[in-house]
């Protein structure tokens, strides 16, 4: 469990470094949030948990984990009907995101990078905080090790404006 908490905090630290960079020049290149999550976590997590993000056609797509076993439409349906509602992001509150979540009620796991829409940062932060609080409440009297993971979860707004959640 401590290894998992440490890995989650390390992922948040890596994300912060990626977003802040080393220079003062403003970078307008779009960021690949799925790749950032992939690179920040252990290979075992990449094998087990898919990372989902919006596709260009308005649907959702995913990489890694079990995503290859789904037809594209089924994958979109699972993301829109099962995973995205867990984050409870208000419609129009973000312009881009990548997330990897456990939908199983026996595990606290969630990593998300969300680019808020103009003026919607607090709405995104509130949604990420609510996800963490839900995980804590679900696990508090159920699975102690998973509660500890949820209790160690973090939400941060990085200097480039993205909201990062690690649970």
Language model segments and positions:
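C-terminal motif of bacterial Sec signal peptides marking the signal peptidase cleavage site
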Residues: 17-21
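Bacterial N-terminal signal peptides that target proteins for export
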Residues: 1-9
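Alpha-helical transmembrane segments
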Residues: 12-16
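Soluble, non-membrane globular domain cores that form compact, hydrophobic packing
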Residues: 23-110, 116-167
């Amino acid at each position: 469990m401590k290894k998992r908490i440490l890995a989650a905090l390390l992922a948040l630290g890596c994300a912060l470094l990626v977003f802040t960079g080393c220079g003062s020049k403003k970078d307008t290149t779009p960021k690949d949030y799925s790749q950032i999550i992939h690179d920040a976590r252990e290979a075992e997590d990449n094998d087990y948990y898919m990372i989902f993000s919006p596709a260009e056609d308005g649907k959702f797509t995913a990489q890694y984990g079990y995503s290859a076993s789904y037809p594209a439409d089924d994958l979109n349906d699972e993301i829109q009907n099962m995973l995205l509602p867990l984050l409870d992001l208000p419609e129009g509150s973000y312009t881009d995101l990548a997330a990897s979540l456990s939908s199983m009620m026996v595990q606290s796991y969630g990593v998300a990078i969300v680019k808020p829409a103009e003026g919607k940062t607090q709405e995104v932060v509130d949604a990420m905080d609510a996800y963490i609080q839900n995980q804590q409440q679900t696990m508090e009297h159920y699975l102690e090790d998973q509660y500890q993971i949820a209790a160690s979860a973090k939400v941060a707004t990085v200097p480039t404006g993205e909201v990062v959640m690690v649970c």
